[in-house]
């Protein structure tokens, strides 16, 4: 019998690279939208692992998919293909515009592949001078050196030496700035169809349409980073489907695996031809375990009743936040769509989003922040009404403790 080593939060500071600052409690069990720590304390989960746990913790369809595949085949590499990867790729083409799929292990890797494809396509078709990538301030696209540079937040990208070049950042939702800058040198515009880390900022209908039209005018590719917005999060399987425009390349991850690491880049057959054998790859991309779980997730999330349920739950959250605001006058506005929501703090509470997060944790509720002024909610897409009501009761107590 194996004797497990006793683990406490202090061990983190002894053995881990200090680029995270985790909570003091250590979760050991999860079920639905509840988790329990080492001491048996229960928490309602409104964070969902930062928009990852789309079916909650330990959902039966995911557990069954993982355990069944674990008894068959774990890994091959891409010297061979495998059945779960092919089935998942087929499903992703059925629920999106895409005709071709590249599998990776994370959102950052999916975005890296998207950017490399955009540059490769432009160089092949128009020449090496067509290399500019336009992205938006306060965007977030991952932590590789390329993707963190394209993300428009200097706090994440500064301090690592010379950055990859030919990347321009413009204000989000600013049509005039984009019109003034985009040119025939632009190979791609990369954007989140709803900015997540930047504060849950939705695009205006006019802006999203203008981006598509300007990309077409200048033969630039439109790349949508749907790492956070995808897989049912906004009430559509992918957010672009509710915006009236279609990207040329789309990245997806986070809730694609429901908690099992996987990412994917989706694109057209025409563009995919430019990543020939050997031009890109991933040892773990398309891993049978990851793809088996993701296939189960996509099947469950793409059901009409699941997507409709997201819209219903959005209303429950908005009603709960409105009641709290009526009581405490804390929020300036509620932003977002589906179950990617941000409660922007008003002037009186400015800069206190983390205070709310910490207070909520003490009451047994997990929430997120999106900058210093926005409390972010990205719960399971199938969270129950009872769990939501319990969570808001805890959030009420948390805010009361701060007044």
Swiss-Prot record:
GO terms under cellular component: cytoplasm
Any single Pfam family the record assigns to this protein: Aminotran_3
SUPFAM superfamilies (UniProt xref): PLP-dependent transferases (SSF53383)
Amino-acid positions noted as binding pyridoxal 5'-phosphate in the UniProt annotation, renumbered to this chain: 107-108, 140, 225-228, 283
Keyword Cytoplasm among record annotations: yes
Superkingdom in the source lineage: Bacteria
Keywords: Amino-acid biosynthesis, Aminotransferase, Arginine biosynthesis, Cytoplasm, Pyridoxal phosphate, Transferase
Gene Ontology MF term list: identical protein binding; N2-acetyl-L-ornithine:2-oxoglutarate 5-aminotransferase activity; pyridoxal phosphate binding
GO biological process, one term: L-arginine biosynthetic process
This protein's record includes keyword Amino-acid biosynthesis: yes
Subcellular location: Cytoplasm
UniProt enzyme class: transferase
Quaternary data: Homodimer.
Other remarks on this protein: May also have succinyldiaminopimelate aminotransferase activity, thus carrying out the corresponding step in lysine biosynthesis.
Name of the protein: Acetylornithine aminotransferase
Organism annotation: Vibrio vulnificus (strain CMCP6)
Gene name per UniProt: argD
